Amino acid sequence: MEGISIFLKKNNYSDNVFFNLYGDQDLINKEKNKNKISTKFYKIFHSSTVVSDEETPLTAIKNSKDSSMWNAINSQTEFNSNITLSAGNTGVLFVVSRMLLKTIDSVSKPALAGLWPNKKNMNVVLDLGANVECDDKNLVDFSEMGAALYKALFPEDIAKVALLNI
């Protein structure tokens, strides 16, 4: 909730962003009371199950279908969210996302993407260590996805792709 409070202050309490919060409702409410954020900026979705940092993706898929991570990703399949932020288990996040969000037919592996701020604007960095083994097709797919993301974010710029691991 403190992060939402900082975001709202930084953006002059603009109502063009709404937060769907997934997790233990009691814990979220305690934080909400500390930060005094208007409910017009968020909605709480209670999830009683937690994915631990030690949990394997396979175990999480079997046991965590009511977890905050599962529910947050699933909210994107139902078009209730466009963005999911997680500070949790990245391996589980990647597998749950791949399972629920799927990929387009021509893409065999998804890639994690990060926006990397620099002195002039932002860079797009893909994969971020999520895929240990990549073949030529995966690298082409990552290049196309990265270029498409960059063009969507910065339509006036030319997307220049650098391949690090060949």
Predicted regions and their residues:
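Anion-binding alpha/beta catalytic cores of soluble intermediary-metabolism enzymes, centered on
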Residues: 1-55, 77, 83, 87-166
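Short, surface-exposed amphipathic charged segments that create phosphate/polyanion-binding patches used
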Residues: 56-63
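Short, well-structured alpha-helical segments in soluble
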Residues: 65-80
